[in-house]
């Protein structure tokens, strides 16, 4: 389907070549917000630090996990944290790590467009590790921030 046009619908679904390829369940993003609201973020790999097993890989953003949660690898749910003053959930990265035989979902919080791309590049190390970026249509906290900012 190279060259096929993609369409994003108001319900958040995405179609490619006329076929729906991505659609979220109603309430999905709100459930993610609830998980975040009840979890503390622990940063164990600050921006600029080296990966413990691959020293040439340097973390472009703060990277950590949500305390009290569990991901597919048995560890806490992974998070990338950007520098935006509004720290809402912007997107997800679905990562396939072929050498480990793992698939994980990583949360992107408060990232600028450039920071989102940095996290995507870090997680995409073809051909062994590949990532899919799933953007949130609108981050509620950013919408609220914009609305409150306009009334001042």
Where are these regions (language model features)?
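Hydrophobic N-terminal alpha-helices or hydrophobic patches in metabolic proteins across all domains
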Residues: 7, 12-149
């Amino acid at each position: 389907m190279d060259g096929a046009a993609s369409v994003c619908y108001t319900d958040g679904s995405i179609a490619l070549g006329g076929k729906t390829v991505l659609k979220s369940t109603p309430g999905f993003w709100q459930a993610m917000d609830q998980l975040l609201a009840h979890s503390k973020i622990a940063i164990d790999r600050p921006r600029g630090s080296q990966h413990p097993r691959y020293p040439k890989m340097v973390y472009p953003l703060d990277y950590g996990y949500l305390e009290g949660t569990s991901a597919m690898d048995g560890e806490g749910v992974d998070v990338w944290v950007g520098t935006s003053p509004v720290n809402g959930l912007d997107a997800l990265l679905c990562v396939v790590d072929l050498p480990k035989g793992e698939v994980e979902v990583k949360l992107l919080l408060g990232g600028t467009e450039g920071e989102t791309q940095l996290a995507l590049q870090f997680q995409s190390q073809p051909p062994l590790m590949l990532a899919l970026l799933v953007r949130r249509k609108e981050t509620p906290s950013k919408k609220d921030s914009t609305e409150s900012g306009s009334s001042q």
